[in-house]
């Protein structure tokens, strides 16, 4: 199991962003068990909740064990308190960062599957809202979406944009 902490330079956010990555790359094989087939990893982009940070999933859950048991790469970016939506006036395009840039960068850096059906996005609270919004907006990238207690008081979203509302109104 590899646990990687890094800072990525984001063009969409105009700054570096802390990101944690879990890769079950050096998984121990028990004697008599078949070796792992060498193929790109299925990947979960996992978003934290408001007032949290990119370490919450590692320190407060069993995500590392889950990743190892399911041969799953997990990418956990810092989302500040952005709701993972674009704020072009402030040059904080978190939606584009999570839905496009982060996926492209991590696929270049790590052996991650490029298949839609192997690429998931999920989150808790604010991250759950961001996962649903960006999973729908970037539906050509994400095959599955998980929203855990998604914070969907859309009228009260900070820096709400018409784009945010339009994504939820689509069927």
Task: Give the residues covered by each predicted segment.
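Non-catalytic cap/lid and distal C-terminal segments of serine-dependent acyl enzymes
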Residues: 1-171
